[in-house]
Swiss-Prot record:
This is Fumarate reductase subunit C. It comes from the Bacteria. The lineage of its organism: Bacteria, Bacillati, Actinomycetota, Actinomycetes, Mycobacteriales. One of its GO terms (cellular component) is fumarate reductase complex. The chain crosses the membrane at residues 30-50, 64-84, 105-125. The keyword Transit peptide does not apply. SUPFAM superfamilies: Fumarate reductase respiratory complex transmembrane subunits. The keyword Hydrolase does not apply. Signal peptide: none annotated. GO terms for molecular function: succinate dehydrogenase activity. Pfam families: Fumarate_red_C. NCBIfam families: PRK13603.1 (NF010126). Part of an enzyme complex containing four subunits: a flavoprotein (FrdA), an iron-sulfur protein (FrdB), and two hydrophobic anchor proteins (FrdC and FrdD). It is found in: Cell membrane.
Amino acid sequence: MSAYRQPVERYWWARRRSYLRFMLREISCIFVAWFVLYLMLVLRAVGAGGNSYQRFLDFSANPVVVVLNVVALSFLLLHAVTWFGSAPRAMVIQVRGRRVPARAVLAGHYAAWLVVSVIVAWMVLS
């Protein structure tokens, strides 16, 4: 005799917003992997010389690649925002025996993200 297994709908997670957000965050790892691969391809093309880099730029101008990168960017932002949102729950920081407010932890993470983004933009654009 086997245990009773209650049937579960295929898209059970789409009914509640919190479950949907969780599933979208989990799916975002695919797009994070795409960006890592894309950046490695950029580095390889730059290292191989001007012709290789031009071929990569032509590949990147393909409308399918542009749409994929826009979708990937939106998922990457979702991934980053939800990652930072979990930080105050994962990091219990105490100063003088009192817990640091969640907003302060979030502000620190977003400030660090902004500083790193400005530095990277400065390095790339200058």
